[in-house]
Amino acid sequence: MEHVLSTLSLEFFGKGKHKTTPEIFFAIENGFLLDVRAREEAESIAIKLDHHRNIECKNIPTDEIPDRIHEIPQDKSIAVCCSGMARSAIVYAYLLSKGFKNVCILEGGYATITDALKPGKILKVLQSK
């Protein structure tokens, strides 16, 4: 973890490489959306992205990440999301400390996902198939 912390400089945060938007992330070829909300949150409002075939979604609550880290693919671009960004930031740093390379935080959390899934944006996804 010390190595990860030592890389989090002003330049790192200033360039914004640690975060992405849903629009950018949903357009990549091979993505993995890691939902780190509590199980109860995910059961109440699930994130499925069934029409975004290039993105795999999985809910692994923050407190289960250490025991379930083997379920997170290292060969995909990973975006971590939660209802805000606090848990995402914690899991982001943890994954970096475990050697994951292609990890970022989904900027704005769940609210930006719902905005990115409005009817016009879903229609564009469907028409691009």
Would you name each region that the model predicts?
Residues 1-53, 122-129:
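Flexible, polar/low-complexity N-terminal or interdomain linker segments that lie immediately upstream
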Residues 58-116:
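Catalytic cysteine-centered active loop of the rhodanese-like fold, especially the PTP/DSP P-loop
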